[in-house]
């Protein structure tokens, strides 16, 4: 018998196949030359040094009728969904977005229309190709840069990788236009010593641009959605219009249980035996993100604490998340809910994918790339309040106040429909 394989009579189950390569983020690395990197660093630094003579300071206003928004590495439009859930679709006007993936641009179009915006008003542009004169000034700038350049699943070349250089291209826009509010997101690995140079550079540029800012690691599970997805967020507000010290939103003290987000009435025919997973992956299998709802096993119930692992582009794109108790894969709407995306938006993305004949699981993969809507909306709420562009009350901090129960799982849907709140309490 060949070593490593078990025969049907051996009593051992054959090993389960891993769904996709383990280190797919290492593909397609384009190394940036030292000259290009030095030139980009110098350009951003120069723009940050002379912003006051070029732009002048923002003027504080009691109420701004239209808020112009721009985003880079826009994906399917997480910022638009967040604005809609905050009830700002009539106040926010998107003016610029960047995205090189044709598939995501098509999904972004569907999301914009579903959220109530005319997609024709968007300026869609490649960050590497846009010219200074083509950049539209915005009040709010949101960017979640590609993670492979910093993630432990990638080669971690930082800004020496072309995808990592997008961080500097985004900072170029910030230095050139100096939006009133800036929201930046990246995997927490950027805080490690290996990437300390670029991290300190980002903070230095924000200081030069006279921003008041805060940075912190926030996870999706900190805001009423049970997914372990730690990300570094930077919230910066122009000093002259900032009301006090900038603080990122407070984390919830109470976690929400995963089972509220799983549709238990839907089961599948894929019989997945948990002991076989235990044998294959070992006692820390839950960290690898292959299964959810591990409450069906006492061993993993305590380890996972009723929380989904980080939903990634690769595994969502390959259907790699299983719910053993229900004998099926994670549904697309469930993945959307665990990212804070309303069902109506997920369905709009599905329709667009079918209409344009996009590859299977395009929507799944896009969800895995995106910022979690609950976290982004909470951060935007703080930024808009600190900048006095919009005033939110404490009772509108939906994700911090919602109870651990079915209401948490449907909160995004109800906010999208405008039915979540009646005065200070949940309907």
Regions found by a protein language model. Name each.
Residues 2-64, 392-427:
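Intrinsically disordered, low-complexity glycine/charged-rich regulatory or linker segments
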Residues 33-181, 188-192, 196-200:
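Core alpha/beta nucleotide-donor-binding catalytic domains of modification enzymes
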Residues 51, 276-427:
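C-terminal target-recognition/interaction regions appended to catalytic cores
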Residues 78, 105, 243, 318-320:
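Eukaryotic short linear interaction motifs
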Residues 82, 173, 205, 379-383:
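Alpha-helical recognition domains of nuclear gene-regulatory proteins
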Residues 89, 114, 208, 344, ...:
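Short amphipathic alpha-helical interaction elements and helix-loop-helix interfaces
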Residues 130-140, 148-317, 325-328:
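Class I S-adenosyl-L-methionine
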């Amino acid at each position: 018998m060949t070593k490593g394989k078990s025969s049907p009579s051996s009593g051992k189950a054959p090993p389960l196949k891993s769904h996709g390569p383990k280190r797919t983020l290492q593909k397609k690395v384009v190394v940036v030359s030292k000259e290009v990197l030095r030139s980009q660093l110098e350009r951003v630094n120069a723009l940050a040094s002379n912003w006051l003579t070029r732009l002048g300071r923002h003027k504080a206003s009691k109420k701004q009728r239209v808020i112009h928004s721009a985003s880079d590495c826009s994906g399917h439009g997480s910022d638009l969904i967040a604005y809609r859930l905050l009830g700002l679709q009539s106040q926010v006007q998107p003016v610029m977005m960047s995205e090189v993936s044709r598939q995501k641009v098509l999904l972004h179009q569907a999301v914009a229309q579903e959220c109530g915006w005319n997609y024709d008003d968007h300026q869609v542009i490649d960050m590497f190709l846009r010219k200074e004169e083509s950049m539209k000034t915005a009040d709010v700038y949101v960017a979640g840069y590609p993670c492979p350049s910093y993630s432990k699943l990638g080669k971690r070349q930082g800004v020496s990788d072309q995808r990592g250089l997008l961080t500097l291209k985004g900072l170029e826009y910030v230095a050139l236009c100096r939006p009133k509010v800036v929201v930046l997101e990246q995997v927490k690995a950027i805080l490690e010593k290996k990437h300390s140079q670029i991290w300190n550079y980002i903070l230095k540029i924000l200081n030069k641009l006279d921003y008041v800012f805060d940075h912190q690691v926030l996870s999706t599970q900190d805001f009423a959605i049970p997914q372990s997805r730690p990300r570094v967020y930077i919230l910066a507000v122009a000093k002259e219009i900032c009301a006090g010290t900038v603080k990122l939103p407070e984390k919830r003290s109470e976690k929400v249980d995963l089972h509220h987000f799983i549709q238990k009435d839907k089961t599948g025919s894929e019989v997945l035996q948990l002991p076989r997973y235990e044998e294959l992956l070992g006692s820390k299998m839950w960290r690898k993100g292959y299964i959810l709802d591990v409450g069906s096993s006492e061993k993993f119930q305590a380890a996972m604490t009723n929380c989904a692992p980080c939903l990634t582009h690769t595994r969502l794109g390959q259907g790699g998340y299983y719910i053993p108790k229900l004998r099926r894969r994670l549904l697309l709407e469930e993945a959307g809910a665990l990212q804070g995306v309303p069902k109506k938006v997920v369905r709009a993305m599905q329709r667009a994918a079918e209409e344009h004949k996009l590859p299977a699981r395009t929507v799944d993969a896009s969800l895995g790339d995106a910022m979690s809507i609950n976290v982004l909306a909470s951060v935007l709420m703080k930024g808009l309040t600190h900048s006095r562009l919009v005033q939110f009350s404490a009772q509108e901090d939906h994700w911090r106040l919602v109870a651990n129960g079915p209401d948490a799982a449907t909160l995004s849907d109800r906010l999208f429909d405008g039915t979540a709140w009646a005065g200070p309490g949940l309907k």
